[in-house]
Amino acid sequence: MRSAKLKFEKRRSRIRHKISKTSNRVRLSIFKSGRHIYAQIIDDSKSITIAAASTLDEKRKKSHCNIEHAIKVGEEIAKKAYAAGIKDVVFDRGGYKYHGVVKALADAAREKIKF
């Protein structure tokens, strides 16, 4: 039987492989820890991070990874992307299942940028 970490890594690599086929768009990448959630907009062709937002920002220093704060992070990353002139991204859920905080962040970001 496979361990949970191995299943996660397999899901993650499968998602990245599918995303690599759409190299003409930038990628909205999600990372979740036990306490915080992070979002980055990455241009893989230039290997640079264009915008980033997380619950670690000064405004939300004591906040944790829950749906309420994931919505705020999603709105913030969408605002930063729109300011940078990005209107179209590929969503990289990073091996996480699409529910809870990942879904909340994605839905909040969809209001300003197109997936």
UniProtKB/Swiss-Prot annotation:
The keyword rRNA-binding applies. GO terms for cellular component: cytosolic large ribosomal subunit. One of its GO terms (biological process) is translation. GO terms for molecular function: 5S rRNA binding; structural constituent of ribosome. InterPro entries: Ribosomal_uL18_bac-type, Ribosomal_uL18_bac/euk. Belongs to the universal ribosomal protein uL18 family. Part of the 50S ribosomal subunit; part of the 5S rRNA/L5/L18/L25 subcomplex. Contacts the 5S and 23S rRNAs. This is Large ribosomal subunit protein uL18. It comes from Rickettsia rickettsii (strain Sheila Smith). The lineage of its organism: Bacteria, Pseudomonadati, Pseudomonadota, Alphaproteobacteria, Rickettsiales.
